[in-house]
């Protein structure tokens, strides 16, 4: 877990200066607490999760459940054996209420579109998005469930960063990850017309270098675990061991989880992204597009390089400002004021800003910059040891292309792929 950097506040309920107060990456997670050992029993009710036991089979006996990989807001995920092709797969079983209700998600349609386009496209980015292998419906006591089948992957990047000092990945690795993510996003945005809307470390997974051998070894060494509560199988977080990314011959990431993804011209929701990775236009209720994924990526690159989450927010203890207020303040402190034309487009602007463009509830802003976050005088902002002085301005320019408050001036994935920093 990324270290929390805190210093004493100068007075009760005062705002800590951004350069002295950053939150851990856990602040970016969803509200359902995915790091709980086991999901709550009431998730297994009408319209909810399907109860699964080890050994259960699905799709006319094709898939046999071997272990549990975990769960999320809309699904449980299981390690299963495909009896037809004799290989291990990840079986994702959606909640029954994901479809057939008043507000269906788009995941099934989006994954189908990804599969169709991937089969026809020559775009390099298709290799960095997790493909759908199969899908089917399953009838259970809580309703009808859509089920997806995927390749089994290794660790997510949140787990990987925790293995490095101060949560900092080697610059060479970050460069590789950045390029692969940009290729994946360009494929999604331009060829598929899909916006992920939830790009974060736990949705970026590493491929296994030898899947069948690695999984067999794990299963032989680690016994299955079952909860004593309600007979629900415990999730096995990080079920498949993965080497350090810096020691992998050719690290290969995959963007996963399209459960809250949207079409470019049809949005699932206007409340998107993990809070600390949320684009400014989303917070103020302005129109958003594929550039929200680019903003999230910029935040992640800083996180991977420096081990900090730059735009996390905290509410005041006495209620004088909200998490959103604080996050907007940090954005202004690092990147400057919001353009008036963007503020005019937000249907929530009046909740946060006065008519002069200043924040309503926070006035003690302390100006800083991207440069000071990457090449500052104190930890955690000191320059990475493996980044040269000459590289600093090039890297800052790369970040600035992603972390621009006005989304119309934010660069696209295709434009960022041409940046000099990726070739250094």
Where do the model's predicted regions map?
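Conserved structural core of kinase catalytic domains
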Residues: 122-171, 252
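Protein kinase glycine-rich loop
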Residues: 65-73, 77
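C-terminal lobe substrate-recognition/regulatory segment of protein kinase catalytic domains
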Residues: 137-143, 252, 259-266, 332-398
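Conserved catalytic-loop aspartate of Hanks-type protein kinases
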Residues: 293
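Glycine-rich ATP phosphate-binding loop
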Residues: 54-56, 76-96
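Catalytic-loop of the protein kinase fold
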Residues: 189-207, 211-246
């Amino acid at each position: 877990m990324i270290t929390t950097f805190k210093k004493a506040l100068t007075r009760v309920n005062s705002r800590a200066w951004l350069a002295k107060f950053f939150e851990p990456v856990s602040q970016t997670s969803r509200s359902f607490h995915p790091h709980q050992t086991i999901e709550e029993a009431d998730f297994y009710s009408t319209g909810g999760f399907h109860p699964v036991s080890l050994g259960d089979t699905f799709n006319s006996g094709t898939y046999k459940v071997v272990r549990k990989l975990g769960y999320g807001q809309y699904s449980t995920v299981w390690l299963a054996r495909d009896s037809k092709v004799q290989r291990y797969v990840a079986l994702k079983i959606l909640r029954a209420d994901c479809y057939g209700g008043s507000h269906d998600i788009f995941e099934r349609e989006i994954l189908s579109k990804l599969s169709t386009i991937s089969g026809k496209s020559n775009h390099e980015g298709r290799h960095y998005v997790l493909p759908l292998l199969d899908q089917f419906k399953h009838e259970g006591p809580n309703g009808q469930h859509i089920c997806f089948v995927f390749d089994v992957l290794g660790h997510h990047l949140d787990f990987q960063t925790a293995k490095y000092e101060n949560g900092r990945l080697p610059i060479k690795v970050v460069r590789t990850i950045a390029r692969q993510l940009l290729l994946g996003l360009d494929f999604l945005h331009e060829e598929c017309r899909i916006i992920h809307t939830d790009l974060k470390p736990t949705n970026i997974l590493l491929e296994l270098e030898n899947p069948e051998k690695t999984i067999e070894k794990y299963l032989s060494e680690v016994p299955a675990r079952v909860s004593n509560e309600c007979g629900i199988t415990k999730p096995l977080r990080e079920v498949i061991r993965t080497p350090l990314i810096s020691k992998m011959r050719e690290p290969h990431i995959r963007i996963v989880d399209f459960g809250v993804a949207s079409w470019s011209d049809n949005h699932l929701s206007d409340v998107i992204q993990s809070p600390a990775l949320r684009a400014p236009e989303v917070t103020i209720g302005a129109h958003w597009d594929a550039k929200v994924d680019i903003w999230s990526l910029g935040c992640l690159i800083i996180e991977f390089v420096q081990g900090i989450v730059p735009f996390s927010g905290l509410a005041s203890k006495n209620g004088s400002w909200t998490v959103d207020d604080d996050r907007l303040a940090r954005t202004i402190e690092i990147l400057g004021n919001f353009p008036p034309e963007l503020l005019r487009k937000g249907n929530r602007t009046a909740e946060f800003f006065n008519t002069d463009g200043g924040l309503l509830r926070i006035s003690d802003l302390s100006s800083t910059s991207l440069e000071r976050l990457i090449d500052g005088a104190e930890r955690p902002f000191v320059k990475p040891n493996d980044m040269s002085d000459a590289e600093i301005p090039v890297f800052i320019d790369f970040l600035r292309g992603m972390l621009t408050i006005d989304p119309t001036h934010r660069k696209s994935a295709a434009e960022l792929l041409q940046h000099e920093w990726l070739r250094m």
